[in-house]
Amino acid sequence: MVIASGDRVSTFRDFCEALRQHRDDYIILLVDSEGPVGKSPWQHLAERVGDQWRRPDAVADDQAQLMVEVMESWFFADKAALIAYYGQGFLGNSLPGQTNIELISKQDVFRALEHASQHAQKGRYRKTAHGFDLIEKIDPVRLRAASPHAARLFEEDRD
């Protein structure tokens, strides 16, 4: 089960609360890295300005998972799904050609989505209107191939 919590602070707070309330379940924190990652996820979250999150006691290393650099990066793993979702007017050929989507900066991800979707049937990309619909359409096999951190997440899939 995936529970979207909203902003980063709420997500971490909800993760910690879920750990307390569901001690027998394997709870995973999944957040945007918001930048390049050169360390373990918990170390990245502990050192990231704005987070400084301490790994809770009795929580395994693999219970922190990152979308590098942002959730929207994952869309580029399956450009066919993006093109099908937005329909006519979507400029799929203008998307970055990088095969490792984690190497595309957050700024370039949003710039490319904005440009490619500007004349699309669904209109310009908006996270609240399009983000969660789109993420459901991404092929997990393509995502694992394009993102080492997504591959790590799927390796840890417990159910």
Language model features with spans:
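C-terminal accessory helical subdomains adjacent to catalytic cores in phosphodiester-
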Residues: 1, 9-159
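RNase H-like polynucleotidyl transferase catalytic core
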Residues: 5
